[in-house]
């Protein structure tokens, strides 16, 4: 199966892809999946999971989920009135060069750290100007806490949004990235805005420019600062404000 997948992806990029270079940046959806504290969460029911009277095996079920939970995409409409809904995000923006900015050292010292414009320009000084069409991911190191809600969010109390503490991105840094022409911005925490945010200014900046967000991104530490290619495959929900995404990286 991995070989077949590699060949299919390779066909899209004009060459065969070594399956060992494909990194899945997606957490599975299950009872442990982390959502915003006031969300319903993921529900999965096995309607039938057995051998039929006719002798053949049959498995089917149903699931329900909030749009924003687990590894997911924020469509621009999420915080931008009149902006793109989930199904309207152009396919051309669902693949692109990955840029990984590591702020894990600062986040380890301050749970509420927010990536700054200086973090972005320091990255560019070392690795080069962020190209138009890039998808920028911020590595905070928060994946080490998944799926332990209290450590990951700062609170594990259902409905409690007043005591959240995790790293995010300053709106000024988001503005700088928008000026670079990026198509998506993601992070390995529950939100591109930090935990204590009440106005979600970073979401507003990105949404107003039709830049999508990626949240709860898994295993960012497996990617190099530059050189990888991202494939972003969200569930195609009409008029969706967001939804589950299968996020893959092709290593250089």
Residue ranges and their predicted role:
Residues 13-252:
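Active-/binding-site microenvironments in catalytic and ligand-binding cores
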Residues 3-11:
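Sec-dependent N-terminal signal peptides
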Residues 2-3, 252:
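C-terminal end-of-chain detector
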